[in-house]
Every structure is written in C-alpha cells, then in structure tokens.
Amino acid sequence: MKNIIIASTSTLHDSGYLEYLLPDLSVHFKDCKTILFIPYARPSGITHEEYTDKAATAFAKINIALKGIHEYEDPISALKNAEGIFTGGGNTFLLVTQLYKNNIITTLADVIKSGTPYLGTSAGSVICGLSMQNTNDMPIIYPPSFQTLGVIPFNINAHY
C-alpha cells in the first residue's frame, strides 16, 4: 500500500520551510530515524548540499535525520534501503532529467508503490503523476522522457 503525502509547496507565506507540514510529517515518518532526500530540483539553482542542509534543518525539528541521495555511491541501494523519502521542489525538468540520468526513476516508483513513506513538495509532487506535462516550470533542460513515477493515476499541477 502506498504511503504518500503530496504537497503543492514546502513553504507558506510568513512561515519556515516545511513548517506547516511538520505535525503531519512527524506522524507520516513516525517509524523513520533517517529520511532520504532527493534535492535534484535545486530551487533557484542552489547546490544539492545547500538544499539538503535546508531540509535537514526542518526535519531536525521533529527529530528525524536527513541525508541527500547525492551523498551515496549507489543511489539505487539508497532508495531500496530508505526508511522514508522526500523529494523537494524546484524545477521539474531538472528533477526528471536527473532521475533518468541517475537511472533511479523506476526504483523510486517501485519503493513508493511498495509502501516506503514518501513526501513530495512542488516538483516532488508533480512527479507522482503519470507524466510531468502539467508543470508550469521553465524548460531549462530537456529530459529523456516526460513519463514520471505513476504512483497516482493522474497528473498534478502543483501551482495551478
């Protein structure tokens, strides 16, 4: 059974990163000591490390550690062994391109479908659908396919 939270945004006006979601995330990820973070969407072009640090600071407030997938030599094993997964927002074209480039899109879909708790915000939500073709993001890079995870049977536009 899938265990997913699909959020349109990570930050509400006048609040901190993930602040509005933290009560729900503490329940959603209650059995997780460490979350695997996928920072590939890189909002405003920040580095994977900067984005991971930002997300880790938020999760620390609910006593959950976070580690970026880019820190692993084998991202497929990291996904298969993850207690929980969070894909952050940013540019959907960049995110999907990196998921294909790192050959992890199928594994990510499989672990979510098998019940690993998942959080997606913005672009991380868009990829839950069948394709990314509803995104409003600028096409800054051309992914090899517009097909995404298909963990829900429809497409999402996170910022309609």
Regions picked out by a protein language model, each given a short descriptive name:
Residues 10, 41-43, 90-93, 123-124:
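Short glycine-rich anion-binding loops that position phosphate/pyrophosphate groups of nucleotides
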